[in-house]
Swiss-Prot record:
It comes from Clitocybe nebularis (Clouded agaric). Homodimer. Keywords: Protease inhibitor, Thiol protease inhibitor. Binds and inhibits cysteine proteinases. Inhibits most strongly papain and cathepsin L, more weakly bromelain and cathepsin B while it is completely ineffective against cathepsin H. Belongs to the protease inhibitor I48 family. InterPro entries: Prot_inh_I48_clitocypin. One of its GO terms (molecular function) is cysteine-type endopeptidase inhibitor activity. Gene3D superfamilies: 2.80.10.50. Pfam families: Inhibitor_I48 (PF10467). It comes from the Eukaryota. The keyword DNA damage does not apply. This is Clitocypin-1.
């Protein structure tokens, strides 16, 4: 399974059943420190807040950090709690597993490396918020949220 190279990316919300939905879409957008990460169109005023640094760590997991201008401190994808539909928070960057979606080259499922009995904890979208979703580890559960990583 190919791993994502370290770099600067925009993250577009897609699904495993429709990894290339065409023009438009919503992108992971920072609102501010300790605020929920939003899903917004890639247009002003959101465009400048959709740039993320992905860094793979020695353990094979990755951090996703906001790479904006004039950032007073480092923050990225984080959480206060890993409950169903809890928001992804822009906070102290946590580690995630980036799992390539089969038959794609740039679409990944973002999973929290947390052991929950029988479920994977994945980053999806609800309304215009990035949230944590639970899916059965056996792969059932239908269409899953995924993210197209477009290099800047």
């Amino acid at each position: 399974m190919a791993s994502l190279e370290d770099g600067i990316y925009r993250l577009r919300a897609v699904t495993t059943h429709n990894p290339d939905p065409g023009v438009g879409g919503e992108y992971a957008t920072v609102e501010g420190a300790r605020q929920p990460v939003k899903a917004e169109p890639s247009t002003p005023p959101f465009f400048e807040r959709q740039i993320w640094q992905v860094t793979r760590n020695s353990d094979g997991q990755s951090t996703i950090k906001y790479q904006g201008l004039n950032t007073p401190f480092e923050y990225g994808f984080s959480y206060d709690q890993l409950e169903q539909n809890a928001p992804v928070i822009a906070g102290d960057p946590k580690e995630y597993i980036l799992q390539l979606v089969p038959s794609t080259t740039d679409v990944y499922i973002i999973r929290a490396p947390i052991q929950r009995v029988g479920v994977d904890v994945e980053v999806g979208v609800q309304g215009n918020n990035l949230v944590y979703k639970f899916f059965p580890v056996d792969g059932s559960g239908g269409d899953r949220p995924a993210w197209r990583f477009t290099r800047e």
